């Protein structure tokens, strides 16, 4: 493929940075959250889900973050260890900060919402002194989550990781991952998103997330093509713009674009697909696949997740994704997602 050059012989292939949380998904679904009485606990947070997804796909994964110094923090570290994810750079909060909690609502397969508790949380207390240059130097790529930029000191820690990655030829993947919690205003969002977006190698986000990132750059909202040209012009090699059920498009720095559609599945929920998409797409990039193959792999993984109850726990393996793609193509035709 040749768009991204990864350094060889590094200990880790990918290291996400930022949010890790606990998801509580209702087991009594198809009703509003206020009516749900029973929930199942899962590991959550986009960077954490991406880490699990890539580890399930066979990659050597590390993680940089901070968790609560309690049973929930122990749950995260134990879960990562069981998944084969390195936890040496996961720090414990020392001042009573909690792990972020997310309660999800599955009112119907197409009506889902998320209630987050994000005040006084551990992941936003990650400090610049807790970012180890050797760790950044020893991975092929880092994933910076936009939520890590929402508040200090996590904001500065993420920016330090960005600078160290650029210094050490470590690829930077920016997953915009917008959550309204903790941000003061939209100007603040645009400023910090742009700082990372202008220095990353791959930037991934929804149309709405690109609009937020560009709100101080342009007078009117951009088209996908205009946004892609802008961020490729800043030095990104790949720009991925997602439109949910309408599919997504990857734009590359040689002027090409590649569009993928979702695979048809019976929806259980309308959240969680983005993290599966990101992990599987990044897997394809690490494997130096053609862009369309990486997009198809990501789209398939996303479809599998929105048909499942959890995010992290249901992340598929390479074999499972390939079997899913094969089954769907036999059922609907070779070009089902590529049309």
Curated annotation (Swiss-Prot):
Catalytic reaction equation(s): 5-dehydro-2-deoxy-D-gluconate + ATP = 6-phospho-5-dehydro-2-deoxy-D-gluconate + ADP + H(+)
Pathway annotation: Polyol metabolism; myo-inositol degradation into acetyl-CoA; acetyl-CoA from myo-inositol: step 5/7
BP GO terms, sorted: inositol catabolic process
Enzyme Commission number, as recorded: 2.7.1.92
Taxonomy, superkingdom: Bacteria
Pfam families registered for this protein in UniProt: PfkB
Gene3D superfamilies in UniProt: 3.40.1190.20, putative 5-dehydro-2- deoxygluconokinase
InterPro entries: Carboh/pur_kinase_PfkB_CS, DKG_kinase_firmi, Myo_inos_IolC, Myo_inos_IolC-like_sf, PfkB_Carbo_kinase, PfkB_dom, Ribokinase-like
Keywords, alphabetical: ATP-binding, Kinase, Nucleotide-binding, Transferase
GO molecular function: 5-dehydro-2-deoxygluconokinase activity; ATP binding
Entry keyword annotation includes Kinase: yes
Function: Catalyzes the phosphorylation of 5-dehydro-2-deoxy-D-gluconate (2-deoxy-5-keto-D-gluconate or DKG) to 6-phospho-5-dehydro-2-deoxy-D-gluconate (DKGP).
Family named by the database record: Belongs to the carbohydrate kinase PfkB family.
Record protein name field: 5-dehydro-2-deoxygluconokinase
Lineage: Bacteria, Bacillati, Bacillota, Clostridia, Eubacteriales
The gene coding this protein: iolC
């Amino acid at each position: 493929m040749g768009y991204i050059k990864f350094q060889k012989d590094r200990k880790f292939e990918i290291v996400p940075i930022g949010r890790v949380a606990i998801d509580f998904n209702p087991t009594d679904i198809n009703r509003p959250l206020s009516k749900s009485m029973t929930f199942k606990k899962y590991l959550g947070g986009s960077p954490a889900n991406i880490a699990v997804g890539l580890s399930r796909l066979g990659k050597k994964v590390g993680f940089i973050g901070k968790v609560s110094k309690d049973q929930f923090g122990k749950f995260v570290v134990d879960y990562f260890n069981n998944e084969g994810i390195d936890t040496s750079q996961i720090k414990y909060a020392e001042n009573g900060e909690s792990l972020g909690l997310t309660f999800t609502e599955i009112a119907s397969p197409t009506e889902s919402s998320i209630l987050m508790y994000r005040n006084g949380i551990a992941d936003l207390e990650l400090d610049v002194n807790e970012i180890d240059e050797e760790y950044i130097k020893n991975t092929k790529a880092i994933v910076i989550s936009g939520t890590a930029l929402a508040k200090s000191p996590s904001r500065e820690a993420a920016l330090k990781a960005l600078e160290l990655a650029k210094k050490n030829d470590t690829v930077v993947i920016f997953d915009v991952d917008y959550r309204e919690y903790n941000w003061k205003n939209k100007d603040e969002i645009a400023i910090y998103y742009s700082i990372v977006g202008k220095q990353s190698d791959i930037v991934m986000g929804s149309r709405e997330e690109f609009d937020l990132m560009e709100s101080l750059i342009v007078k009117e909202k951009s088209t996908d093509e205009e946004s892609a040209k802008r961020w490729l012009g800043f030095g990104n090699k790949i720009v991925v713009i997602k439109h949910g059920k309408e599919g997504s498009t990857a734009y590359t720095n040689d002027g090409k674009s590649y569009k993928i559609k979702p695979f048809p599945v019976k929806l259980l929920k309308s959240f969680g697909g983005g993290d599966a998409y990101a992990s599987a797409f990044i897997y394809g990039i690490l494997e130096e696949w053609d862009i369309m193959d990486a997009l198809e792999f990501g789209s398939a993984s996303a479809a599998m997740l929105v048909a499942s109850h959890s995010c992290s726990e249901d992340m598929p393996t390479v074999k499972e994704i390939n079997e899913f793609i094969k089954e769907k193509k036999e059922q609907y035709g070779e070009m089902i997602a590529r049309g």
